Amino acid sequence: MDKLEEIMASKRKSLEHVIRPIKARELETLARSKSPSIPFIEALSSPDQLSVIAEIKRKSPSAGDIAKGMNAVEQARVYNNSEADALSILTDTDYFGGSLNDLWDVVDFLHQHERITPCLRKDFMVHPIQVLEAAEAG
């Protein structure tokens, strides 16, 4: 088994307790009700300007620890103050040291400070329930 197969098997196993049938209508309804303040594509499409997606990542399978113990909200604050156009938040725990709570916390921070930086959940997406989780986080 190669590394990607190992990661995907681990991800499926970790989701066993939350998996339930998801209807397309449920995803569509959530998508309509959770539109971001500024669309992701719009945030990255300023003409004549380099767009930056800043990543919140503690470790990776290939590099090991990158920023062990990093506070996701503090890192988001640094990136936001540096005018990142969007944030990518790793939510995989086992291989990247993140969590879905990191996404919730960063989105809450941005809303509390009236910032409109779009956030992307970066994970191994193997089931539609993960899309719902990301949308619920904002």
Summary of predicted features, one role per range:
Residues 2-67:
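An N-cap/entry alpha-helix motif that binds or orients negatively charged groups
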Residues 35-42, 47-48, 97-120:
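Alpha-helix-loop-beta-strand connector modules within alpha/beta enzyme cores
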Residues 51-55, 86-88, 118:
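Short, conserved beta-strand segments within well-ordered enzyme catalytic domains
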Residues 55-59, 68-70, 96-97, 118-131:
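Glycine-rich beta-to-alpha transition loops that act as phosphate-gripper elements at the mouths
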Residues 57-61, 70-71, 88-94, 98-106:
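Arg/Lys-rich RNA-binding interfaces used to dock onto structured RNA substrates
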Residues 66-90, 109-114, 128-138:
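Alpha/beta enzyme core
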Residues 98-101, 105, 126-129, 137:
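Residues forming well-ordered secondary-structure scaffolds
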